[in-house]
Design a protein with these regions (language model features):
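Conserved "right-hand" nucleotidyltransferase catalytic core of DNA-directed polymerases
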Residues: 1-19, 108, 117-292, 308-310, ...
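Conserved DEDDh/DEDDy metal-dependent 3′-5′ exonuclease domain
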Residues: 3-5, 9-136
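Short glycine-rich phosphate-binding loop at a beta-alpha junction
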Residues: 40-52, 204-207, 315, 380, ...
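Conserved catalytic core of nucleic-acid polymerases
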Residues: 159, 348-487, 493, 498, ...
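Short, contiguous acidic/charged loop-to-helix segments that flank catalytic cores in large enzymes
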Residues: 259-263, 280, 290, 299, ...
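Function-dense linear segments that define catalytic or interfacial modules
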Residues: 96-97, 119, 274-353
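Short active-site loop/helix that positions an aromatic residue
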Residues: 50-60, 70-80, 214-222, 317-332
């Protein structure tokens, strides 16, 4: 496959290296060049997808493949199967300085900053050499390709945006909170609830947004509260608790998805969040702004497909337990995972008496339950599924020894650090503190291997799906065809012409099957999907909306 590297040059120009050919282009000429070369299906190599791809999309140019050097360097440097010394060399310290960028950033670096003009070809050669020298080169290569494809999908989703009815959103806010308040003031609905809370606790000046004041009020009322989380408040009995919980719920809506949020993140009838691929250590995505990974049910009615279009919403049932079966090679658990409900499959196979027992045991194994009903279930199921439960147990023990663990494709966990045995002042920590830190890191590594591999499956899913959707309709730019508009760990939302809804749903299912086959070649693992075709995102999963379980 042809690799074409792109590097920025001073003077609003860039250098293109295509095999043995090198040429300089004006930045404004790049879209036409990329469009012409896409027919050859090259892999575009650049420092950061979020810095290169948005302008191409704006020009109507979509690319199939890329290699994101920033993401790749971070991945290879931490991969246990790769030698990080192979990444050293000229400009390596500047590559280490690269940080995630958002499409809205006007300029991350000054024009004389070395990080602005890095040599993509040199860094690409280093990363390719590090992968080639690894004893797990095929897996690492797949992970690098999937990670970069995810970056393309993220940029495309921000570009296309989630169709958004501003009038519906404003009506929801007004119904729940009252009219839009002046800047810095509470809405009428919140102010009324605050007055109820003050009256119930007998403190006229109480600020329910202040955690210290709220804790003091709770204790003054004789309530045993150590924090003000909703889960803690629900356990307390007092006339002020109900209005306080309602206040906290609506205050969160006002702060995170209120009028100011819409002003910043909704434009042209589209909600355009900024995703950060591999934003967490496990490879899961995070948000660079807009709350892309936090989409409250209260505002979902405002996400309405365009006229003549629909949403196809699909989520994976029990992703991480199925991933555990696949990565461990546990055929007994894989048999239980056949069909729509893995937990019920465990019951049907005679592993446990009830579905709740199955859920307690599997989640307990992945999160380290050692006591209570969950701990008892873990002990029993370990004998039934020794490979699956043994994998997470060994990951936990490795973490407790201070060792790094890895996902199926080779993403490495962050290390405990050489100073794990020291306290904050650099002195040897006491044995109890060391043991607590080891156990805490062991709980992290136990979950890391499964959650990280689940993220790899999801990357392979959307990497394949974005190309399948593109091929469903062979005319027009990205947003005139079926396309991804939202992704959340184990859920995708596709915006598609209604006439292509069934075809889009079929492609979502086929991409899920292909991702499972790609990762777990020797073991057949089902990844059933709950699929809905709806006009409003709020209707997904409701009776009458589901097409079928695939």
């Amino acid at each position: 496959m042809t690799r074409i590297t792109l590097s920025r040059l001073p003077g609003d120009r860039l250098r293109v290296r295509d095999r043995d050919t090198e040429l300089a282009l004006a930045t404004g000429d790049l879209p036409a060049y990329v469009q012409a070369r896409e027919a050859d299906r090259p892999r575009w190599v650049w420092d950061d997808t979020a810095r290169w791809y948005p302008s191409l999309l704006t020009a109507g140019v979509r690319v199939e493949r890329c290699h994101d050097l920033r993401l790749g360097r971070h991945l290879v440097r931490r991969a246990p199967a790769a030698d990080p010394r192979l990444l050293e060399g000229e400009e390596s310290e500047h590559w280490d300085r690269l940080r995630p960028s958002a499409p809205s950033d006007p300029a991350l670096f000054s024009v004389d900053d070395r990080v602005e003009f890095l040599d993509a070809e040199r860094e690409d050669a280093r990363q390719l050499a590090a992968v080639a020298a690894s004893n797990e080169a095929p897996r690492l290569g797949l992970l690098l390709a999937a990670e970069s494809a995810g970056a393309l999908a993220a940029a495309e989703m921000t570009h296309a945006g989630v169709p958004w009815r501003v009038d519906v959103h404003e009506r929801l806010l007004t119904d729940l909170l009252g009219p839009r308040p002046p800047r810095g003031a509470r809405p009428q609905g919140l102010e009324a609830l605050a007055a109820e809370v003050r009256q119930a606790f007998g403190i006229p000046a109480l600020n329910p947004d202040s955690r210290p004041e709220l804790l003091a009020a709770l204790r003054r009322a004789g309530l045993d509260a150590t924090d003000t989380r909703a889960s803690t408040l629900r356990r307390l009995e007092h006339p002020g608790i109900v209005p306080l919980l309602r206040y906290k719920q609506l205050a969160h809506l006002f702060q995170t998805n209120g009028w100011a949020w819409a002003d910043q993140w909704v434009s042209g009838g589209r909600f355009r969040p900024s995703y950060q691929p591999a934003g967490s250590s496990t490879g899961r995505w995070s948000s660079n702004g807009g709350g892309a990974l936090s989409f409250p049910v209260q505002v979902r009615p405002a996400a309405v497909a365009d006229e003549g279009w629909v949403f196809v919403v699909a989520d994976v049932a029990q992703l991480e337990p199925r991933v555990l079966a696949g990565m461990s090679g546990d055929r007994a658990l894989a048999r239980s995972a056949q069909g729509a409900d893995l937990y019920q499959g465990m019951v049907d196979d005679g592993a446990v008496a009830t579905r709740n027992d199955a859920k307690l045991g599997l989640l307990g194994a992945m999160y380290g339950a050692t006591s209570g009903e969950s701990g008892r279930m873990v002990a029993g199921l370990t004998r039934r599924y020794p490979q699956a439960f043994g994998l997470v147990e060994e990951a936990a023990r490795a973490g407790e020894r201070g060792q790094v663990v890895r996902t199926l494709l080779g993403r490495g966990s962050p290390g405990l650090g050489e100073d794990w045995g020291l306290d904050a002042e650099g002195r040897p920590a006491d044995p109890d503190a060391q043991a607590r830190r080891r156990r805490s890191y062991g709980r992290f590594t136990r979950n890391f291997v499964v959650q990280g591999t689940g993220a790899e499956w999801a990357l392979c899913w959307i990497a394949d799906l974005r190309n399948r959707l593109w091929r469903l309709h062979d005319v027009g730019p990205l947003d005139s065809r079926p396309h991804l508009v939202f992704f959340l760990h184990d859920e995708v939302v596709v915006h598609t012409p209604a006439a292509l809804a069934d075809a889009s749903a079929a492609q979502i299912g086929e991409a899920a099957t292909a991702a499972g086959s790609l990762l777990f070649r020797e073991l057949s693992i089902d990844f059933p999907l709950n699929i809905s075709i709806v006009r409003s995102y709020a209707d997904a999963g409701k009776p009458g909306a589901a097409v079928e379980d695939q």
